[in-house]
Amino acid sequence: MLKIILCALNEAQNLQTLIPNLSNEIKSLGADFKIIICIDGSNDESFSLLTDLQKNHPLEILPLKNEIGLGLAYKRLFTEIVNNSADDDLAISFDCDNTHNPEQIAKMLNYFHKNSLDFLVASRFCNKSVIEDFPIHRKFITKTTSLILQNLFAVKRISGEKLQDYTSGYRIYRVKKLKELFAIQKNNFITEPEFTYTCELLIKLARINSRLDEIPISYDYGKKNGKSKLRILRNFWRLMILLLKLQVRL
């Protein structure tokens, strides 16, 4: 089964079209699936909208009364996945802001299965990736983050090349490997409360010999609706602290 996991903070205007599009795309693949979405303390119409969408789509809602941050919201989602999924299930993480294209899931799944992967990143920075309308300041921070992580940790793809994109949220995970990490780390498998959880989880999965890779993605930031929730400077400093913690545990 495919478990599509999303975290939403005041994303009602996007969810109204995203959930049907995502659901219809997975249905076209003939796969058994469920969409699980964590509402991270939203104060818009997200909950009522999703409740209505449940009538026509396999949708599970995990509402949080107060905002706890992207990382901890995904920790809630991954805990749900680990506790209530079969080993051969796959989890696909997906952003709610319209920048991820559901039509690329088929290509990602094909590559994942063909190469017997445990973890796949939809990459914005590897060869043949396409990024449109990505703000210069965000591209600089994101690319700089990945370069720092490449030099410190050098996570390797199945080809032996260094992984290029450490922060993309568009990913496929093998649930069996998530359970293995959870058994080792227990409640500490994700400790970062915000965006930097993407780096933390990737590095921890690499350290338990996950078979991982990345695949080019078409990423159109111009399709994004609503104000960005990403606090760039705060997350950059959180990343520096995370790097120190991970280095100590090498």
Placement of each model-derived feature along the sequence:
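Hydrophobic helical membrane-anchoring modules
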Residues: 1-6, 13-24, 28, 107-110, ...
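Residue-level preference for short helical/loop micro-motifs built around acidic side chains
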Residues: 13-17, 44-48, 72
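Acceptor/aglycone-binding surface of glycosyltransferases and processive sugar-polymer synthases
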Residues: 62-80, 90, 102-191, 222-230, ...
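Short beta-strand/loop segment that forms part of the nucleotide-sugar
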Residues: 31-42, 64
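Hydrophobic/aromatic residues located in beta-strands of well-ordered beta-sheets
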Residues: 4, 35-37, 61, 91, ...
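Short helix-capping segments at alpha-helix termini
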Residues: 26-31, 54-59, 85
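Short beta-strand-to-loop acidic/aromatic patch adjacent to the donor-nucleotide binding site
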Residues: 85-99
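A conserved acidic beta->alpha catalytic loop
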Residues: 39-48, 98
